């Protein structure tokens, strides 16, 4: 399994819709880049100025919204993930 470092988070991305609400099938280049996903792993946290650590707000299993162009795509053991910093996560979906 992937173990991110520091304030990084590994996201299993939710795929973009294949067709519109009206039933129009979208070409691959017409789909919006996904902005939602499930957190599958989190780093150990932030190192503060005094040397202490602060845990991340998100945790494994959280469904999140993130910035459209954030992160780096990563493939591991045949699966695709997105590695990003916690600051690029906009919200936790409840």
UniProtKB/Swiss-Prot annotation:
Subunit structure: Heptamer of 7 subunits arranged in a ring. Interacts with the chaperonin GroEL.
GO cellular component: cytoplasm
Pfam families, A to Z: Cpn10
Gene3D superfamilies to which the protein is assigned, alphabetical: GroES chaperonin
Coiled coil: none
Location of the protein in the cell: Cytoplasm
Keyword DNA repair found: no
Name this protein carries in UniProt: Co-chaperonin GroES
Family per similarity comment: Belongs to the GroES chaperonin family.
GO biological process: chaperone cofactor-dependent protein refolding
NCBIfam families hit by this protein: PRK00364.2-2, PRK00364.2-5
Stored InterPro entries: Chaperonin_GroES, Chaperonin_GroES_sf, Chaprnonin_Cpn10_CS, GroES-like_sf
Lineage: Bacteria, Bacillati, Bacillota, Bacilli, Lactobacillales
The keyword Chaperone belongs to this UniProt entry's keyword annotation: yes
Function (record text): Together with the chaperonin GroEL, plays an essential role in assisting protein folding. The GroEL-GroES system forms a nano-cage that allows encapsulation of the non-native substrate proteins and provides a physical environment optimized to promote and accelerate protein folding. GroES binds to the apical surface of the GroEL ring, thereby capping the opening of the GroEL channel.
Keyword terms: Chaperone, Cytoplasm
Molecular-function GO terms, alphabetical: ATP binding; metal ion binding; protein folding chaperone; protein-folding chaperone binding; unfolded protein binding
């Amino acid at each position: 399994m992937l173990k991110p470092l520091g304030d990084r988070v590994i996201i299993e991305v939710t795929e973009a819709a294949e067709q519109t609400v009206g039933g129009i099938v979208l070409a691959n280049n017409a789909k919006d880049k996904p902005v939602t996903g499930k957190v599958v792993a989190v780093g150990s946290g932030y190192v503060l100025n005094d040397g202490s650590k602060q845990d991340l707000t998100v945790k494994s299993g959280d469904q999140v919204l993130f910035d459209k162009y954030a992160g780096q795509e990563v493939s591991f053991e045949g699966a695709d993930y997105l590695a990003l910093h916690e600051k690029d996560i906009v919200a936790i979906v409840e």
